[in-house]
């Protein structure tokens, strides 16, 4: 039997909505790099060394 290991992360995935074009996408709240909207290119998430700065509307927190 093959064992599967799941690690608990401190962060969460978020569904966010771009304020410019209205596109929805899923991002990690502790991102290590800039995350941009795949439609218009606006920066949605900025890394800060811990929890990221979210520059979009948060619609829901995903489990």
UniProtKB/Swiss-Prot annotation:
**Where does this protein come from, organism-wise?**
Methanothermobacter thermautotrophicus (strain ATCC 29096 / DSM 1053 / JCM 10044 / NBRC 100330 / Delta H)
Subunit text: Part of the 30S ribosomal subunit.
**Designated gene of the protein:** rps27e
Into which family does the record put it? Belongs to the eukaryotic ribosomal protein eS27 family.
As to how many cofactors bind and how, the note says: Binds 1 zinc ion per subunit.
One GO MF term, please? structural constituent of ribosome
Note the zinc finger regions (C4-type) by start and end residue.
18-40
Positions that bind Zn(2+): 18, 21, 37, 40
- GO:BP terms for this protein? translation
- What name appears for this protein in its UniProt entry? Small ribosomal subunit protein eS27
Q: Where is the signal peptide?
A: none
């Amino acid at each position: 039997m093959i064992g599967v290991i799941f690690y608990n992360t401190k962060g969460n995935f978020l569904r966010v909505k771009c304020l410019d074009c209205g596109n929805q996408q899923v991002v990690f709240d502790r991102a290590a790099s800039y995350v941009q909207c795949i439609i218009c290119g606006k920066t949605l998430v900025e890394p800060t060394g811990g929890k990221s700065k979210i520059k979009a509307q948060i619609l829901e927190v995903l489990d």
